[in-house]
């Protein structure tokens, strides 16, 4: 089995585990164990080094700590793809880049349409712009050879650009009041990591030591701590198939797929339907997220990618048709992990009472988009 097959098989398993974790979270949040579930996530954990101490509830350790490892993996994957993968052919970058951009703009505009008159609600405009690569590849893999491999590659490229956009959005729009001292320390640790690469240090443990120091500095700076993962990834040496980047990526991938993302899903997807009524389903935040994911994503991606397929003969050799493109566009509306993550950033300092609305919108929008996308691809794609 080559690395590409291994990647897609692992992402398929990851999608299934995410689904199971999300379902368990929803069941638990609507059972007599709901109080225990909420208490478990609120338990404080502390880490002390000398005179410095970091104390956070378990939920934030997952969202700020473990998700930094997830972003480290995303950064490694992006760097690898730019150096020698999907994104290395500059002539093929335009289609997934423009498609991802259109898939970002339309959901954001739909969210803004429903929430333009609510300044606090409006802070969640980026929630429906995300695509969950694990879930989307998991859904597509269930269809087997009905979906051309070239479309799976393209879906991955779109998701990578989507992740890049999410990183930029988090850095620009979801950053708190900044601490210049902590930012200065973060810069120092970043320069040290760059120096380690330049002077050909090839010990992962040394990079991780200064990487943890960078994470702490970023955490204290007001910039979201997960971005430290991206910075670390960009400094990791990549000199071919057996490089440190490859070894670190391979080592992290299983931890992310089998532990970090399912744990994140279980901690964040616990939507309680107790007391749910029609007024909650028509809440501007729910409508903006749900319709942004289901309607906005499919419009943006189908119009953009459909144009390239129909008029520019993109993927002509693979006999990709517009029906398949539409199915892929629908599946890209599965925002789940990243949408929930951005939602937690958007309202954490303004109105936490909106988080149930975020979860309802993300769960319903992602579920409908994923189900309809699966059905469209199943009905319209020929068995190959």
Curated annotation (Swiss-Prot):
Protein location: Cell inner membrane
GO biological process: regulation of pH
Membrane topology according to the record: Multi-pass membrane protein
Keywords for this protein: Antiport, Cell inner membrane, Cell membrane, Ion transport, Membrane, Sodium, Sodium transport, Transmembrane, Transmembrane helix, Transport
Coiled-coil boundaries: none
Catalyzed reactions per annotation: Na(+)(in) + 2 H(+)(out) = Na(+)(out) + 2 H(+)(in)
Cysteine-cysteine disulfides: none
Molecular function terms from GO: sodium:proton antiporter activity
Stated family: Belongs to the NhaA Na(+)/H(+) (TC 2.A.33) antiporter family.
Function recorded in the entry: Na(+)/H(+) antiporter that extrudes sodium in exchange for external protons.
Stated name of the protein: Na(+)/H(+) antiporter NhaA
UniProt lineage: Bacteria, Pseudomonadati, Pseudomonadota, Gammaproteobacteria, Legionellales
Gene it is expressed from: nhaA
């Amino acid at each position: 089995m080559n690395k590409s097959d291994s990647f897609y098989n692992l992402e398929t398993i990851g999608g299934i585990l995410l689904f199971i974790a999300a379902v368990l979270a929803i069941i638990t949040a609507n059972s007599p164990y709901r109080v225990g579930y909420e208490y478990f996530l609120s338990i404080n954990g502390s880490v002390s080094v000398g005179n410095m101490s970091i104390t956070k509830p378990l939920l934030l350790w997952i969202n700020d700590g473990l998700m930094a490892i997830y972003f480290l993996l995303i950064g490694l994957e992006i760097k690898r793809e730019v150096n020698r993968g999907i994104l290395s052919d500059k002539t093929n970058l335009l289609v997934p880049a423009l498609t991802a951009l259109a898939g970002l703009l339309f959901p954001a505009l739909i969210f803004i349409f429903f929430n333009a008159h609510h300044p606090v609600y409006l802070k969640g405009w980026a929630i429906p712009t995300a695509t969950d690569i694990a879930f989307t590849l998991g859904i597509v893999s269930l269809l087997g050879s009905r979906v051309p491999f070239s479309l799976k590659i393209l879906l991955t490229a779109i998701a990578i650009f989507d992740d890049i956009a999410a990183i930029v959005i988090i850095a620009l729009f979801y950053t708190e009041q900044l601490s210049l001292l902590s930012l200065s320390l973060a810069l120092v640790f970043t320069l040290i990591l760059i120096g380690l690469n330049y002077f050909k240090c090839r010990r992962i443990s040394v990079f991780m030591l200064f990487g943890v120091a960078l994470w702490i500095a970023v955490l204290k700076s007001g910039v979201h701590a997960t971005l430290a993962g991206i910075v670390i990834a960009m400094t990791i040496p990549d000199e071919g198939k057996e490089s440190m980047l490859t070894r670190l990526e391979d080592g992290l991938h299983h931890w992310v797929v089998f532990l970090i993302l399912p744990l994140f899903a279980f901690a964040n997807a616990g939507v309680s339907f107790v007391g749910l009524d029609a007024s909650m389903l028509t809440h501007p935040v729910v409508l903006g997220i749900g319709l942004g994911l289901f309607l906005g994503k499919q419009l943006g991606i189908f119009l953009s990618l459909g144009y390239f397929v129909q008029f520019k003969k993109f993927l002509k050799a693979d006999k990709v048709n517009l029906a398949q493109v539409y199915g892929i566009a629908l599946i890209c509306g599965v925002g789940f992990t990243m949408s929930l993550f951005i939602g937690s950033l958007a309202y954490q300092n303004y109105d936490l009472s909106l988080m149930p609305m975020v979860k309802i919108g993300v769960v319903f929008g992602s579920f409908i988009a994923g189900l309809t996308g699966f059905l469209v691809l199943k009905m319209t794609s020929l068995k190959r």
